[in-house]
């Protein structure tokens, strides 16, 4: 070794020492942020920060930190400081009061590929403009118009489930709820009927499933987290978290549908796509100049694609968790079926107004969303340094609300792991702080399709429970283990037994039952 040393000059040794020093400093430099703020949290490792803790799962890590550090703590995703908050007043300030001025945007790695202008990642004025164009698609009047279309697909769902029930086999519930969600979304949004339940190999379904295969420890994700300066470089090189073949398929398919509208092949109903196209009228949206209202052609395709992705995954997962909760809590399912038999005796067709007035159905769905919020974390980025409740949050810091953990806080929810729909009864609902229950987010940047999803879920579940019951089987995993994904989903498919109901109450019997009020 000693004979090797002289071959390096003093300048070389100086440069090597400087390089090593820079590497060490780079690895440790960002991790003093929360110490200076007096914020507790797990000890970060050089370069990785606290990311390796995610091997436990997002939800487990967040809950562990809450139990150890209290309602405010700091973590590091690579070099990125993330302030986690479960204080109600801070949550309100971040999501509501200062949404437009400071906390407008979500975290964005800028590796979204063609989805760079989708509503979910759009920022500031671009987000406001796109949101204002899309909002009319989700008014009560529009949703009521879509209800008839939803019923067509819920009927197909029911037929498919009946075939499976007749075989007396266990079912992977998402294999039914996924196609139903896809069919409802494509038909209401673009007036395109896929019938994916009977065509499981349809490219729309197979491609959307490929989009969901996101690994937290994906090399691309790790590279950007550990070396943030590579993000803009990778973006310029067209790298994306989403498979290129998948996004190319959807953009080509949606462009073809839009082209048909542009050439006069219009639909009889005003759907999601048509409302976006109409926004272009009177606006020059193809020149790339500053937009004042209408959407560009590319923005239209991006919103259509994110609507497919979000509508498929969030709705089908919510329905799967709801079926699981009913199967593992038979007394709740029985009570819900009593309400269904009262409101719609003798398997009467589902009517929109009556469905919206079902109190216990609301309670059950809300409680399922409390236990399994599809977005287990809400994130916002501080556009400038701000002080909230005596805490100075630096510019570019991520502020994170751990929804999963918040929804299971024993100081807020008694027996938080128990499935108790009565928490959301009319008597109890008023006492629930809106900043402790946020399955769809909160504030101006909440989920725009929330009411659409709830109607679709309620309709399908009521029609299913008119004819069937869910029950656990040997293959049902209890409790569920969550996967390490951005959206909440079980690590393994939820498998249940579906059985035809016997002795469904007659019209006379059903109408004598009192509608549950808790």
From Swiss-Prot:
InterPro entries: Cyt_P450, Cyt_P450_CS, Cyt_P450_E_CYP3A, Cyt_P450_E_grp-II, Cyt_P450_sf, Cytochrome_P450_3A. One of its GO terms (cellular component) is cytoplasm. The keyword ATP-binding does not apply. Induction: P450 can be induced to high levels in liver and other tissues by various foreign compounds, including drugs, pesticides, and carcinogens. Heme binds at residue 447. One of its GO terms (molecular function) is iron ion binding. PROSITE patterns: CYTOCHROME_P450 (PS00086). This is Cytochrome P450 3A27. It comes from Oncorhynchus mykiss. The lineage of its organism: Eukaryota, Metazoa, Chordata, Craniata, Vertebrata.
């Amino acid at each position: 070794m000693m004979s090797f040393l002289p071959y390096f000059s003093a300048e070389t040794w100086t440069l090597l020492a400087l390089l090593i020093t820079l590497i060490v400093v780079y690895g440790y430099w960002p991790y003093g942020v929360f110490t200076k703020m007096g914020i507790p949290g797990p000890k970060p490792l050089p370069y990785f920060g606290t990311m390796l803790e995610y091997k436990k799962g997002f939800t487990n890590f967040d809950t562990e930190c809450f139990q150890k550090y209290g309602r405010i703590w700091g973590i590091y995703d690579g070099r990125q400081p993330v302030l986690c908050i479960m204080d109600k007043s801070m949550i309100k300030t971040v999501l509501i009061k200062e949404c437009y001025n400071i906390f407008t945007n979500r975290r964005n790695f800028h590796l979204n590929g063609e989805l760079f202008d989708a509503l979910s990642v759009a920022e500031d004025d671009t987000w406001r403009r796109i949101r204002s164009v899309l909002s009319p698609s989700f008014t009560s009047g529009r949703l009521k118009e879509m209800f008839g279309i939803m019923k067509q697909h819920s009927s197909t769902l029911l037929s498919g489930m009946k075939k499976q029930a007749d075989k007396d086999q266990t079912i992977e519930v998402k294999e039914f709820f996924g196609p139903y969600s896809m069919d409802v979304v494509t038909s209401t949004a673009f007036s395109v009927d896929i019938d994916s339940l009977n065509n499981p190999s349809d490219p729309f379904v197979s491609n959307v499933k490929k989009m969901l295969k996101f690994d937290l420890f994906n090399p691309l994700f790790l590279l950007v987290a550990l070396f943030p300066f590579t993000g803009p470089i990778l973006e310029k090189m067209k790298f994306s978290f989403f498979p290129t073949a998948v996004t190319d398929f959807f953009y080509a398919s949606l462009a073809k549908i839009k082209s048909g509208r542009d050439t006069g092949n219009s639909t009889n109903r005003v759907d999601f796509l048509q409302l976006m196209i109409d926004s272009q009228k009177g606006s020059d949206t193809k020149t790339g100049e500053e937009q004042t209202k209408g959407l560009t052609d590319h923005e239209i395709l991006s919103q259509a694609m994110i609507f497919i992705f979000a509508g498929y995954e969030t709705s089908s997962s919510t329905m799967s968790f709801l079926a699981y909760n009913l199967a593992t809590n038979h007394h709740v399912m029985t009570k819900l079926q009593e309400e269904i038999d009262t409101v719609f005796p003798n398997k009467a067709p589902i009517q929109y107004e009556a469905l919206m007035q079902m109190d216990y159905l609301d309670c059950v769905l809300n409680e399922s969303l409390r236990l399994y919020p599809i977005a287990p974390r809400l994130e916002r980025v501080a556009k400038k340094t701000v002080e909230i409740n005596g805490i100075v949050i630096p510019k570019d810091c991520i502020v994170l609300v751990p929804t999963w953990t918040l929804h299971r806080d024993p100081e807020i929810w008694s027996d938080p792991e128990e499935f108790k729909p009565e928490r959301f009864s009319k008597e109890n609902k008023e006492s629930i702080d809106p900043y402790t229950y946020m399955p769809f987010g909160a504030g101006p940047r909440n989920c725009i399709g929330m009411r659409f999803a709830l109607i679709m879920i309620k309709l399908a579940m009521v029609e299913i429970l008119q004819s069937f019951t869910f029950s656990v089987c040997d293959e049902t995993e209890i409790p569920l283990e969550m996967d390490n994904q951005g959206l909440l989903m079980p690590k393994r498919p939820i498998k249940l037994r579906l059985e035809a109901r016997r002795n469904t109450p007659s019209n006379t019997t059903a109408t004598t039952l009192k509608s549950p009020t808790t």
